[in-house]
Curated annotation (Swiss-Prot):
Protein name as annotated: Probable manganese-dependent inorganic pyrophosphatase
Organism: Bacillus cereus (strain AH187)
InterPro entries named among the record's database cross-references: DDH_dom (IPR001667), DHH_sf (IPR038763), DHHA2 (IPR004097), DHHA2_dom_sf (IPR038222), Mn-dep_inorganic_PyrPase (IPR022934)
Xref: PANTHER family: BNIP - RELATED (PTHR12112), MANGANESE-DEPENDENT INORGANIC PYROPHOSPHATASE-RELATED (PTHR12112:SF22)
Top EC class of this enzyme: hydrolase
Pfam families, alphabetized: DHH, DHHA2
Catalytic activity reported: diphosphate + H2O = 2 phosphate + H(+)
Domain of life of the source: Bacteria
Length: 309
């Protein structure tokens, strides 16, 4: 049987990795030869989850057409966030919870996108719909994905469906969601030992906003000053990325997991759009974004609207 690769976006977060593993397992249970892979490095937060539930991380690939003809996307759909040669393979399915942009296919496909906080929440439903029992380890990874995407249920993207799914999965996994979740988030917020290049690419995504090319990177921290003390070095590496990729804006967002506020560092010729979008003034290229924790709900749509205004 021909193999199908299942993967999340580049610079994968916990949902991208864990949902690839969970969905590949579901597809295997349903008779497909599916393998989860990843398009980037595994973050400290994700590694904590993999280690905790004793699951091996997926192998890394840069291209997919050299291995398979068919792929399944989880936690993304936009081409620039996917495999470098995504145009050379057939996308069989997409399971996602983001905006739909820069995506089209030549054939009809199974496309499931729901306005929930996490792909794993959708997968929890799909396991039930197919009558497949979720293994303890996989339930733990799916729980980890929901906790990560919802910032332990505090993000505005978090829905009642996400909370309910997390409680179900925590029971299967045999953990206390709140206690485990805080440990996992703290592991992810430990940025010691990371280079500046790693910091700005840990969780970075590219977007087309009107005619502008924008990259938004986000890291979680227990204290934003722990990251911003390196601002001069950060600006240097961000400026290099802006020039290399021809970006109009690179927004580096440092989110405080205790206060649920963020600080944005904006570099690029369109940095003023951040001021316009949030009604703030950039001082030394930074501004506090009160109550902003979600790139998907509080950054991407707000900036997109500002660019198109």
């Amino acid at each position: 049987m021909e193999k199908v690769l299942v993967f999340g976006h580049k610079n994968p977060d916990t949902d991208a990795i864990c949902s690839a593993i969970a969905y590949a397992e579901l597809k295997k249970e349903l008779g497909m030869n599916a393998e989860p892979v990843r398009l980037g490095e595994i973050s400290g937060e994700t590694q904590f989850a993999l280690d905790y539930f004793k699951v091996e991380g997926p192998r890394f690939v840069e291209t997919v057409a050299n291995e398979v003809d068919n792929v399944i996307l989880v936690d993304h759909n936009e081409r620039q966030q996917s495999a470098n040669d995504i145009e050379s393979v057939r996308v069989l399915e997409v399971i996602d919870h983001h905006r739909i942009a820069n995506f089209e296919t030549s054939d009809p496909i199974y496309y499931r996108c729901e306005p929930v906080g996490c792909t794993a929440t959708i997968l929890n439903k799909m396991y039930k719909e197919n009558g497949i029992t979720i293994r303890k380890e996989v339930a733990g990874l799916m729980l980890s994905a929901i906790i990560s995407d919802s910032l332990l249920f505090k993000s505005p993207t978090c829905t009642e469906q996400d909370v309910a799914a997390a409680r179900e999965l925590a029971e299967i996994a045999g953990v206390d969601a709140d206690k485990y979740g805080l440990e996992m988030l703290k592991a992810g917020a430990d940025l010691s030992g990371k280079t500046m290049e790693q910091l700005i690419s840990l969780d970075a995504k590219e977007f087309q906003m009107g005619n502008a090319k924008v990259e938004i990177a986000q890291v979680n921290a227990v204290d934003t000053n722990d990251v911003l003390v390196h601002q001069a070095e950060l600006e240097k590496v961000i400026s290099a990325v802006v020039e290399e990729k021809g970006l109009d804006l690179f927004l580096f967002v440092v989110t405080d997991i205790l206060t649920n506020d963020s600080v944005g560092l904006a570099i690029g010729k369109a940095a003023n759009i951040v001021e316009k979008a949030y009604n703030v003034s950039l001082e030394n290229n930074t501004a506090t974004l009160k109550g902003v924790v979600s790139r998907k709900k509080q950054i991407v749509p707000v900036l997109t609207e500002a660019f198109q205004a």
